[in-house]
């Protein structure tokens, strides 16, 4: 049996650590390219989407993906934009409470998808300004693909300071 409480604490910690001092369209491009390179290395077929202030500023779909991946992205993004947490966090919270998104929040699972892969773009002293999303793998793999790219990007820029 999974320890949902520990998973929630770990996800909360990720959201505290993975914070940007700025997030520009160039930032989105760089993170998107990191995700592409990591997916190529692992031979993964995914769709990537990055939005800032609800404007799409990066999108890439590997061969072998479909419009279904875009639909998953839209539904995962709605979760982040509503709750200001990663879609995986909300999914784990629901599992811990043993409730569906309909039961707990009275919203449609056709519109809101509480599965991993969408991670909030969190700006220091501002809060959530967007979302980085991957679709095409398991929910944990989608989530980890985004988190590892953000971590790599932040580590790279912090090493130059």
UniProtKB/Swiss-Prot annotation:
Coiled-coil region(s): none
Superkingdom of origin organism: Bacteria
SUPFAM superfamilies on file: GlcG-like
Pfam families: HbpS-like (PF03928)
InterPro entries, alphabetized: PduO/GlcC-like, PduO/GlcC-like_sf, YBR137W-like
Gene3D superfamilies, sorted: Haem-degrading domain
Family: Belongs to the UPF0303 family.
Protein name in UniProt: UPF0303 protein CTC_00911
Source species: Clostridium tetani (strain Massachusetts / E88)
């Amino acid at each position: 049996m999974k320890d949902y409480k520990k998973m929630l604490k770990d996800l909360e910690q990720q959201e505290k650590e993975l914070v940007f001092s700025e997030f520009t369209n160039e930032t989105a491009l760089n993170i998107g390219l990191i995700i592409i390179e990591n997916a190529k290395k692992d031979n993964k077929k995914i769709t990537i989407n990055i939005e800032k202030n609800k404007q799409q500023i990066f999108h890439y779909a590997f061969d072998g993906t479909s419009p279904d991946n875009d639909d998953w992205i839209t539904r995962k993004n709605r979760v982040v934009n509503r709750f200001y947490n990663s879609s995986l966090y909300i999914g784990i919270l629901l599992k811990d409470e043993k409730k569906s998104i309909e039961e707990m929040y009275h919203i449609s699972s056709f519109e809101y998808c509480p599965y991993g892969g969408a991670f909030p773009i969190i700006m220091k002293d501002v809060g959530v300004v967007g979302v980085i999303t991957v679709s095409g793998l398991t929910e944990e793999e989608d989530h980890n693909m985004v988190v590892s790219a953000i971590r790599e990007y932040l580590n790279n820029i912090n090493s130059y300071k």
